[in-house]
A protein has these predicted regions:
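Short intrinsically disordered terminal tails
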Residues: 1, 104-108
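Acidic, low-complexity, intrinsically disordered interaction modules
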Residues: 39-88
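Charge-dense polyanion-binding interfaces
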Residues: 78-105
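Low-complexity, intrinsically disordered short peptide segments enriched in small/polar/basic residues
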Residues: 12-13, 34, 67, 72, ...
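N-terminal acidic leader/helix
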Residues: 2-34
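Terminal low-complexity, poorly structured segments
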Residues: 7, 21, 26-27, 40, ...
């Protein structure tokens, strides 16, 4: 069974939806609500489902996106916007929709 372009786009979008949503919301929350310096990484993960930036940018799905020319700088910029936005969830939706647009209209 072959995968056509539309199915591949849907697969990529599903990966993006799952990975980006939780990460950006956690990242935005942490920037708005700093954690005490003595909190352990394990506590951060348990409490906020948060992965540090190094792990995030080394992740397989991130590499997959960059293979499609969605750059580190672009994603980092959108994360910064989301974190500083009054309503991070709305900003995250914009970010996710922008990736969908790129995948559907410019990349495949």
């Amino acid at each position: 069974m072959s995968i056509n372009s539309n199915n591949m786009t849907d697969l990529i979008i599903a990966i993006v939806n799952d990975a980006v949503s939780d990460w950006i919301l956690s990242y935005a929350y942490l920037l708005k609500n700093p954690i005490k310096i003595n909190a352990t990484h394990k506590q951060l993960n348990e409490r906020y489902k948060f992965k540090n930036a190094d792990n995030f940018f080394r992740s397989e799905w991130f590499k997959f996106l960059t293979d499609y020319k969605i750059t580190y700088d672009w994603i980092a910029n959108k994360m910064s916007i989301c974190a500083n936005y009054k309503y991070p969830y709305k900003a995250m939706i914009y970010f996710r929709n922008r990736i969908k647009y790129l995948l559907r209209n410019e990349l495949l």
